[in-house]
Amino acid sequence: MRLSRYFLPILKENPKEAEIVSHRLMLRSGMIRQQSAGIYSWLPIGLKVLNKVCTIIREEQNRAGANEILMPTIQSADLWRESGRYDAYGKEMLRIQDRQEREMLFGPTNEEMVTDIFRSYVRSYKDLPLNLYHIQWKFRDEVRPRFGVMRSREFLMKDAYSFDLDYEGAKMAYYRMFVSYLRTFARVGLQAIPMRADTGPIGGDLSHEFIILAETGESQVYCDRAYLDLAVPGADTDFRNDAQLTDIVTRWTTPYAATDEMHDEADWAKVKPESQVSARGIEVGHIFHFGTKYSEPMGAKVQGPDGKEHLVSMGSYGIGPSRLVAAAIEASHDDAGIIWPKAIAPFGAGIVNMKPGDEGCDGVSEKLYEALTNAGVDPLLDDKDERPGAKFATMDLIGLPTQVIVGPRGVAAGEVEVKDRKMGERQSLGIEAAINMLTAQA
């Protein structure tokens, strides 16, 4: 993409309404625009990042055996009355009527609808286990939306729902999602720590929040430093191997880790002082086993191997892709702007033509652009006639992993300057060497 043809509305000043780093940088870098309280438009560069996050989520959900569907945002109030949640749910749920005065709602979550889909088609234990997921925009009328897309009223959510014959099957479904989440966050470029979470009235031990450590986190968290050294499950993980999954979950839940709500001082005291990490954290995912909470009132049953009907045991698993984008910025930025992990960077590299109109600079910039595009690097070519300082500031702000600087002096020497955004290191390379280095990283 050429910057002269790209819609990138950069803000030079920090927006007054932005309270945290991610909100400020997303507005300044032209990723989003606020349309009303807690509701945002995603602009081209922001949407590219969001789509890359969703691609990784999809790949890992599919790898774990989940099936993607897409449910409507508008739901019937009747389904929610079946589960008993329609009257119990607070003002966060937006309730509407259609022209026939039928009561509808803008879905804040999808347990009822996915249970209705399941009970309409699945009759036998032979069709289990089953996991259905979708990625969908949701709306919750937050009393005080703040922090940009971190706590917005409209947000993108990946929610998955598992169906199993009994608790043992549901536990393994939970383990599959647990491991899938570890891989998802690692691929996005984040170090997420699973922490014990409140299970509510259902009880049990199957509820975890996935937390990344960040100074601007909303909650206080406590964990053993051992988590920082744990190896994330590899791409060769066999999601059909219950023993392997159990071993991974055991390793990732044995060291102490808890949010402030679940913090236990007695257990915390057992962690060596030098291994204690007390910090702020951001929730980026939540998985939860809720048994027959929805299958019982909604009659979601299957015939078991004993010939009898059994209520299915269910779980839900959520990741907010839009929130995850903001969390990645909170975890990786500096005073100049965003530092994107390579996997979700909007472009693979930025080419900075220091002197558009100069035959040499234009020629080298075009050669780099064509070579990197053909190699799948997806570069952004800054071909605009602006001051060098403004060009550098824009590239640092939008956080592309690598910048290739093309100037008259370097071109005369047959070289370009390559800058690593994260490390700040610069090196002069021959043009072919620069192309080879960047294509090798693609």
Swiss-Prot record:
Keyword Protein biosynthesis: yes
Enzyme class per UniProt: ligase
Keywords: Aminoacyl-tRNA synthetase, ATP-binding, Cytoplasm, Ligase, Nucleotide-binding, Protein biosynthesis
Main localization, broad class: cytoplasm
E.C. designation(s): 6.1.1.15
Pfam families for the chain: HGTP_anticodon, tRNA-synt_2b
Gene Ontology biological-process entries: prolyl-tRNA aminoacylation
Matching PROSITE patterns: AA_TRNA_LIGASE_II (PS50862)
InterPro entries, per the entry: aa-tRNA-synt_IIb (IPR002314), aa-tRNA-synth_II (IPR006195), aa-tRNA-synth_II/BPL/LPL (IPR045864), Anticodon-bd (IPR004154), Anticodon-bd_dom_sf (IPR036621), Pro-tRNA-ligase_IIa (IPR002316), Pro-tRNA-synth_IIa_bac-type (IPR004500), Pro-tRNA_synthetase (IPR050062)
Localization: Cytoplasm
Protein's UniProt keywords contain Protein biosynthesis: yes
Catalysed transformations (reactions): tRNA(Pro) + L-proline + ATP = L-prolyl-tRNA(Pro) + AMP + diphosphate
GO molecular function, one term: ATP binding
Chain segments annotated as transmembrane: none
Gene Ontology cellular-component terms listed: cytosol
Record's subunit section: Homodimer.
Family: Belongs to the class-II aminoacyl-tRNA synthetase family. ProS type 2 subfamily.
NCBIfam families cross-referenced by the UniProt entry: PRK12325.1, proS_fam_II
Function per UniProt: Catalyzes the attachment of proline to tRNA(Pro) in a two-step reaction: proline is first activated by ATP to form Pro-AMP and then transferred to the acceptor end of tRNA(Pro).
Protein name, as recorded: Proline--tRNA ligase
Gene encoding the protein: proS
